[in-house]
A protein has these predicted regions:
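Short glycine/proline- and aromatic-enriched beta-strand/turn motifs that initiate or cap beta-hairpins
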Residues: 28-72
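Transmembrane beta-barrel architecture of outer-membrane proteins
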Residues: 42, 55-57, 94-100, 143-145, ...
Length: 181
């Protein structure tokens, strides 16, 4: 088994959870209560990097507010990585096209509108390209997954985002920027 060159996922999750708690406590004490992080009919653009056992995905996505507490969206991501399997080197590329829906807990939890805590489901079609002759696992197909995340807006438009997901090929974590239109 090839040893990962990336951050240990359990350490990363522990540190990012601490960061989210700190952001929550800071924003709760500084900002007044608001209506929610995204309004019905509002668009939000997201982009960033991910962390997984299958390379570092780069992603871009768009969310649309269908209700003050619910968004639907789409995302495109791509990752490349190299692997040694049975003594031979292989290159892989995975592209994921997905749709998602999230429930945003700001109103329910009565937290400031600049802090967005959400959870939801996603359905993605992944396209797995690999070197000729590769005998390991890897095929294209559909994947159903779940995500939970947090977003901190430091002004009316810009925010930072941290998300954890699982149960499909987009499993892992993501960190990036969000822009509300």
């Amino acid at each position: 088994m090839k040893k990962s060159r990336f951050i240990n996922p359990s350490d990363f999750r522990k540190h990012t959870l601490s960061l989210l708690i700190l952001l929550f406590l800071t924003s709760y004490s500084i900002y007044a209560q608001g209506d929610g992080p995204i309004s019905k009919g509002q668009l939000q653009l997201n982009a960033g990097l991910g962390f997984s056992g299958w390379g570092v995905p780069v992603y871009i996505g768009l969310d649309y507010g269908v209700h003050p507490d619910i968004t639907i969206g789409g995302e495109l991501s791509n990752r490349n990585y190299n692997e040694t399997f049975l003594g031979s080197g292989y290159s892989h590329s995975i592209t994921v096209i997905s749709v998602n829906s999230n429930y945003h807990f700001s109103k329910l939890l009565d937290i400031p509108s600049n802090l967005d805590i959400y959870a939801g489901l996603n359905l993605g079609f992944y396209i797995w390209n690999t070197s000729v002759g590769y005998q390991g696992s890897g095929s294209s197909g559909l994947g159903l997954g779940a995500q939970i995340g947090g977003r901190y807006y430091f002004n009316d438009n810009w925010g930072i985002n941290l998300e954890f997901g699982g149960a499909n090929t987009t499993s892992g974590s993501k960190i990036g920027a969000s822009y509300r239109f």
